[in-house]
Amino acid sequence: MSRRSSFPVHLHGRSMLLVFVGGALGTAARALLSAAAPTVAVISVITFVINVIGAFVLGWLLESLALRGPDEGRRRDVRLFAGTGVLGGFTTYSAFAVDTDGLIVASNVGGGILYAAATIAIGAAAYLAGIALGAAIGCRRGVSA
């Protein structure tokens, strides 16, 4: 067994670099979109949109990669760079939490609960839709696990 293979993949320098660079790009994209988007009441609408889009794309990406074979080589690199890095940096749980807290602090507890529940439910639905799209495209191309 080589020294490199004895380390978990997340401790390999290449893996860390892929996640770091992807995360920087995803964070920059989110920052640019957030700066250009309006705030409604005390929440940033773009945070909701970014998180839903990110969930959808992550579902599609992971399903597409899974259908193409084991999580190794190029597929692993794509998952680490695009999934963990870009989409991890693009989506934002912290801004979602701040938006929810902002509604609650502004004495809109119901709005905070609704915003949180809607974000989670719609994000989960978007993720499942992304998986379905990845599976449908994979079936059309004749790709199977």
Curated annotation (Swiss-Prot):
Catalysed reactions, semicolon-separated: fluoride(in) = fluoride(out)
Function: Fluoride-specific ion channel. Important for reducing fluoride concentration in the cell, thus reducing its toxicity.
Cited InterPro entries: FluC (IPR003691)
Protein name: Fluoride-specific ion channel FluC 2
Any single biological process term in GO: cellular detoxification of fluoride
Membrane topology: Multi-pass membrane protein
Membrane-crossing residue ranges in chain numbering: 16-36, 42-62, 80-100, 113-133
Family: Belongs to the fluoride channel Fluc/FEX (TC 1.A.43) family.
